[in-house]
């Protein structure tokens, strides 16, 4: 995957985007040199790079120019004082991003990393935040002697380099890291926490539609279900077994 990322810098161009006032002679020269057809040339009247707008926003910072700030709310299902694992054992908790905060999920992961009854944490990762609390919690769990299995999908488009870096950090912390199958991308969002119990083991499962990413949870509409339903936990265990059996062939 690292080699493929490097090769991306040397791939053949597929289009030219330029200013509508760009010199026609220079345009023809570029088209011939790059082997581009006229249909692959896109003149634009607007600025090609709008990143300068962020600088203007920081300088002006006029509230009248900005949308009203929306802050994710705390879920009425969640107590701020009781442990998340205990709350989920009592009832399923469904979070709706970005209207509700991702904080209960982060608390679940952070508390599990410090819980002596937790035997293992298994999770699939596709895209995570730059300063990821999820990665921090997984590393902390591994350092505390908990078995942590992380399936990292390296082919998350344009996040390949980031995911390679996260994989190395997880491995240094003692996590078991496997990668996606050659046959398909692993795009599922699945977390399974296994605890010791009087009768054997107890599963706590999280299933969601959105990435484990604190930043994008503020923007994208997604659902996140946290449940202690043991049938769902057993199914999640089978999913991880199947993914591991397939992915280990290529890891």
Residue ranges and their predicted role:
Residues 1-249:
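N-terminal localization/anchoring segments of enzymes in phospholipid and broader phosphate metabolism
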